[in-house]
Amino acid sequence: MRGSQVPRILVVEDELMIVLMLESLLLEAGFEVADVATKVEAALAFVEAGAFDVAILDANLAGVSSAPVAAALTARSIPFLVVSGYATAQQNGAFAAGLNVQKPFQTETLIEALRSILSASATE
């Protein structure tokens, strides 16, 4: 993370209602939403730009796996949460480096997971 600045989050999610809910709860928790991507290609462009500290990644974007995004995040050592309705299935392959948060999730669970991976990445 960049100094003492507010942590910036990339949200990769294709459902508008979930995006709006995430933006609201992240702001309330003291985070900044850096960007929102609804498709794999857009998410990969944001990862390439790297203007965020952590990502929240939906495992499935309108029927398309976001595994390429997870792989790109891992290659750049950017921490991420995998938010998915699929229990442990997404913990394999490219998603293995992320912390899994199952949908539907409690707000506290998501915020605690974000703080945990940000804290872990700050000590590396």
Walk through the language-model features, giving the residues of each.
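Conserved acidic carboxylate
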Residues: 13
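Non-catalytic signal-transmission and effector/linker regions of two-component phosphorelay proteins
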Residues: 1-8, 41, 92, 99, ...
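Acidic, metal-coordinating helix/loop segments flanking the phosphotransfer/catalytic sites
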Residues: 36-54
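Active-site residues of response regulator receiver
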Residues: 58
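The feature encodes the CheY-like receiver
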Residues: 62
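Acidic catalytic/metal-coordinating carboxylates
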Residues: 39, 65-68
